[in-house]
Amino acid sequence: MNATNVAIEEAAVPLRAQRRHPKTFTEMLVSSIIGLIASLVLSIDAVVLAANPSADLNCNINAAISCGKVGLSWQASLLGFPNAFLGLIAEPVVITIAVAALGGVRFPRWFLNSAQVVYLIGFLFAYWLFYQAYFVIGALCPWCLLITITTTTVFVSLLRVNILDNNLGLPPKLHESLSIGLRAGADTMGVLIIFAILAGLIFVKYGSVIFGG
């Protein structure tokens, strides 16, 4: 087969086959970019707090909204360094995956499964941090909340791709049922419910402080 025939065959591949899930990967790209920005801000704040623990950060608004209080807690450096540094590592990887997928790259199943496991850990970690901030630390960090939101959207987006493509190796009937639900918007509804619960929790505990009651 000569180069001309190869070029003809490649041109004959449908564009849709080269670019699967464009909407989902676009959502993943936007979310990871926002998450990277939030991680960068938190990383800078962590350096500032390390140099001056009494520094007045821009997001130290009141008793309920205080990045400084959260940033000085042991939970903010669970592994011995600021948690935000993990975002500086993880988010560029997600951005690369999303851009490559939008460009037509097809990743092997093991790679996407590994990414799903890693982001599952990140997802659980984000909500553990929210729990700690809400129930233990007693203050909220806007940038941390933003990372919780973007981590959720990226995790669900990746899960959607892995379920629809059956990278998880699900039984046929289960795969079909989950795929029908996803195409009907079950994942979007699930994310909205999670965000509504978070908003409700914040309003119940901190609403009077946040809104000046």
Where on the chain are the PLM-derived regions?
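Membrane-interface loop-to-helix entry segments
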Residues: 71-93, 140-152
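Membrane-interfacial, low-structure loops and terminal tails that flank and connect transmembrane helices
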Residues: 2-22, 165-185
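N-terminal signal-anchor transmembrane alpha helix
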Residues: 22-50, 196-203
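Hydrophobic alpha-helical transmembrane segments
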Residues: 81-103, 121, 125
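Hydrophobic cores of alpha-helical transmembrane segments in multi-pass inner/ER membrane proteins
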Residues: 2-3, 32, 89-95, 147-165, ...
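Extracytosolic (periplasmic/ER-lumenal) interhelical loops and adjacent juxtamembrane/interface segments
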Residues: 47-82
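Membrane-interface helix caps and helix-loop-helix hairpins in membrane proteins
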Residues: 106, 130-142
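Juxtamembrane boundary at the C-terminal end of a transmembrane helix
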Residues: 199-213
